[in-house]
Amino acid sequence: MNKKLRVGIIGTGNIGTDLLIKIQRSQYLECSIFTGRNLASPGMRIAASMGIRLSDEGIDTIVNEPNLCDIVFDATSAKSHLSHAPILDRLGKFVIDMTPAKIGTLCVPAVNLDEAVKSRNVNMITCGGQASIPIAYAITKVHPEIEYIETVSTISSRSAGPATRINIDEYIETTEKGLRIFSGAKEAKAMLNLNPAKPAIDMQTTVMAEIESPNLKQITIEVEKIAQQIQRYVPGYRIVVLPTYDNHRLLVTVRVQGLGDYLPKFAGNLDIINCAAIEVAEHFAKKNLMRNK
């Protein structure tokens, strides 16, 4: 059996619990501590049934026992991560930030995975960022002159937990920052709609760019290419509207369905960021395990 890198998860809500279940399938990762604030939470009960070590002392558990883990997923909130980040940095941990705190290197695995894992703190941006930024990146590979990009993500209200709702402002800021960085556009706008429809809808994200005379054929090639790369770690990622041009605007729409691990399949918004985070952790683990052979 291959040696695995030990993972600590701070935050035992939807994101943290789904990460825990995904880690159980990994050839390169094992969860050594699942820590939050409430031992009676649903996530804690699931972790206990798996025999995972639990704690209700949050980050203090890792501070008191630094050798517990090599990688830390912070699945708390942007505000909490602002205080967690310097502590974990002093402990020398490789940190994957699931919040929109935007302290570390912004990462979309299909775009900058190798570069991101050179950092000690990797920020997974937002669910809308993971869905839209690769499309924006593909479009501006063909048309780097684009100056304005906009993205609108619509998710089921049932998939928006307390952390998502608390972090809405940070979500907008971080998604817009990621769009500007990866596309090169001077201006970016991000919007998030919560849809209460029943049955619940899958996540859907539309990317719009202002452009004159687009090369639709080449844009379509680049968009389909990057979608295939994303599907390697997010199987439910699909282009539902190929590049379309109307009234000086280029549009592409994607839909994301989750794997249905801890979260329902319609919660593709949570699944895409978790799948991306696992991809980062496994890439880091493979590099370190090879180095230590």
Region spans (language model):
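Active-site-lining helix/loop region of Rossmann-like oxidoreductase modules
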Residues: 6, 10, 14, 130-250, ...
